[in-house]
């Protein structure tokens, strides 16, 4: 089953409509997979995406919480795992409709293995060009832990 997603950014007049395709055994592998699912759903989601994950696929993990790299290593090698943290808040206004809740968020990412740094820096550029204020971090785990501590208190 294919889905569509509408992204809306407040106060800047930018909307994006993204269309998905159903994933089946015939699909080619993807270069980059960005995961945002809930922690408890990560492994099942990755299992369902196996047909499009290859040895060349990078996975960018922007989930809240800790320990996701342990699950990711079951699907891709460490030099293809990019951990990250985002301060872009969003809300689902209806199924398939997402609105950014702030106008000045950012994304910090880092590959778990230095061998993947060059590719990760290319992804930083793509995210920045898309207006997501991305940067390469030399210690993204610090930021991930900091956000986990804040979320643990606030939520």
Regions found by a protein language model. Give the residues of each.
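Flavin (primarily FAD) cofactor-binding/catalytic cores of flavoenzymes
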Residues: 1, 47-49, 119
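Rossmann-like NAD(P)(H) cofactor-binding subdomain of soluble oxidoreductases
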Residues: 10-97
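Short, charged/polar "capping" segments at the starts of alpha-helices
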Residues: 1-2, 69-70, 117
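Glycine-rich phosphate-binding loop and adjoining beta1-alpha1-beta2 segment
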Residues: 1-13
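Internal alpha-helical scaffold of NAD(P)-dependent oxidoreductase catalytic cores
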Residues: 51-52, 74-80, 95-154
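Short linear interaction motif-like sites in intrinsically disordered regions of transcription factors
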Residues: 2-4, 89, 146
């Amino acid at each position: 089953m294919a889905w569509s997603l509408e992204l809306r950014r407040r106060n800047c007049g930018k909307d994006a409509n993204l269309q998905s395709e159903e994933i089946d055994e015939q699909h080619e592998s993807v270069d980059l997979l960005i995961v945002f699912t809930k922690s408890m759903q990560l492994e099942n989601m990755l299992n369902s995406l196996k047909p499009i994950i290859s040895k060349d696929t990078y996975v960018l993990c922007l989930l809240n919480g800790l320990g996701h790299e342990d699950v990711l290593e079951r699907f891709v090698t460490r030099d293809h795992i990019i951990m990250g943290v985002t301060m872009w808040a969003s809300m689902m206004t209806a199924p398939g409709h997402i609105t950014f809740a702030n106008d000045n968020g950012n994304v910090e990412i880092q590959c778990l293995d230095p061998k993947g740094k060059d590719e990760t820096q290319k992804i930083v550029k793509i995210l920045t060009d898309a207006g997501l204020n991305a940067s390469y971090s030399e210690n993204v785990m610090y930021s991930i832990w900091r956000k986990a501590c804040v979320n643990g208190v606030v939520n």
